[in-house]
Amino acid sequence: MDRFTIKGPVKLQGEVEISGSKNAALPILMATLLTDEKCVLNRVPNLRDIRTTFKLLEVLGKKVEYNNGTAVITKNKELNSILPYELVKQMRASFWVAGPLLARLKHTQIPLPGGCAIGVRPVDIHLQGFKKFGAAESTKKGDVVISADELKPAKIVLRFPSVGATINIMMCASLIPGKTIIENAAKEPEVEDLICALKTMGAQISIDSKGRIIVEGKKTLGSMTHTVVADRIETGTFILAAAATKGDVVIKNCVPEHNDILLENLKDAGFGVSVGQGRIHITAPSNGKIKPVGIRTMPYPGFATDLQAPYMVLLCVADGGSDITEDIFENRYMHAPELVRMGADITIEKTMAKVKGVKELSGANVMASDLRGGAALVIAALCAAGDTVIDRVYHIDRGYENIEAKFAALGAKIVRDNPLKD
């Protein structure tokens, strides 16, 4: 397996361009299953999860051509409703094909998905929505089987504003003639980007003044042409890398308002934050000291759970102590013991992490256990004195395009290798 060797400390300097959002591209790619027409998606990042999705689409009957960030999806054969476990186990987002397949075929059989091992991430909210449409659910040899004789529009109230459930239910509703109302829906930019993509296919979707998603379903949808929104989590990761290393970095081709909460926290912590059209400039505190500012993860527009791990690194090098409360996922502090190996002072108490800043982190051998935790270890390595070796970087490759090249362009000394191939 590949690993990173990073020599620190370094103050990052320069400019970095943000890729298209993985979390937006994935559901939009799944949405191509809603039509037999040609779909063109631009700014698609070249990532492991994206490549897995291409394979899923091909198994289900699509032809996928990908070149230079543009994916062209066309019909190859009749849709298949059954997914292979070998692909589904690699990625939790694979369950997002359920909505389109149920809408098109009235039947789908999907193994329970894989992805990062972050606590309990159930699909029950998705299934409750499908039941409201008239579908029945059963299990068969570890697979979830969802089927219906007829699907009808419905009013659906989500018990939690789940991004995945909102996406799945909305895609399914777009092919159920009549009005579907989704209450307590997720408000993430990735949901809004999917809505934009579905509209190019002819879907009629709106968000009312109460935040409800209103879908006027159609019998068929047409072709799609869409450009994926900038990745707000990659943006936040580079913001935090610049901050933790007390660097001077301009982040380009981003959407600054998607990280408003994070930027406000950095201002409170003493950092220079300058925002322009599609760009963010981060500079170190004028007095050289990072004021500790605690966070609580919440659904958007609150603090993103996907940035909790990178933010913890910032607190590890701050002047003083502060707390992190993780209210979205269970067991999302798996990176903390690895940071402790590097000299961090972190105490975990159920959903809270108490972090006391230390004078300096030290290089160590550590292991990425999930995508965002892996990114946090990269930032910690950039702050640490000496060499840090990060194993299992395949987790990081799931969500960051050319991460080592982007950090190297900012002055990082980062090398990828595979010791088993040497």
Curated annotation (Swiss-Prot):
Cell wall formation. Adds enolpyruvyl to UDP-N-acetylglucosamine. Phosphoenolpyruvate binds at K22, N23. Belongs to the EPSP synthase family. MurA subfamily. It comes from the Bacteria. One of its GO terms (cellular component) is cytoplasm. UDP-N-acetyl-alpha-D-glucosamine binds at R92, D306, I328. Keywords: Cell cycle, Cell division, Cell shape, Cell wall biogenesis/degradation, Cytoplasm, Peptidoglycan synthesis, Pyruvate, Transferase. It comes from Elusimicrobium minutum (strain Pei191). Gene3D superfamilies: Enolpyruvate transferase domain. It is found in: Cytoplasm. It catalyses: phosphoenolpyruvate + UDP-N-acetyl-alpha-D-glucosamine = UDP-N-acetyl-3-O-(1-carboxyvinyl)-alpha-D-glucosamine + phosphate. GO terms for molecular function: UDP-N-acetylglucosamine 1-carboxyvinyltransferase activity. This is UDP-N-acetylglucosamine 1-carboxyvinyltransferase. The keyword Zinc-finger does not apply. The modification 2-(S-cysteinyl)pyruvic acid O-phosphothioketal is found at C116. It holds the Pfam family EPSP_synthase. GO terms for biological process: cell division; cell wall organization; peptidoglycan biosynthetic process; regulation of cell shape; UDP-N-acetylgalactosamine biosynthetic process.
